[in-house]
């Protein structure tokens, strides 16, 4: 017996909706008290179409960041959301070299995420726009870099900029990725 598996998320939802959901996931992960809870904006269960479009524009830089990821062979929305999060921490670390000093990042449980979120909020961490993430990504990742090397380069840059703060948390299917995946499934 042979088994055939079809990936139909994009077919059923449309690619547009799938990327809308990715923006919503980032919004929830950064702002909801179930996750980091660092934003002042409350997460609502049924945002308007205008809000969804605004979030997508904000996080994905009018889709330029999504297109850039896809050119590198990154097609999974879970992976794209992970890359955004890693790059957002790196943008923040470049803006304030002491931001992560003394912190211990733990993405493995909701209480640990909230603790990290509280510490980041106290240190005035601000989620960067998709444009800032795109600018950083373009400086880190050469145009001809393939998928696996993209993750290596971005994770290495964050590890270097934040010392051991994110040790053991990065990488595909690491605890940061799993936390974002859980938010996606929420």
Which residues make up each language-model segment?
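Active-site neighborhood of HAD-like aspartate-dependent phosphohydrolases
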Residues: 1-61, 79-82, 89
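A metal-dependent, Asp-based hydrolase signature
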Residues: 55-186
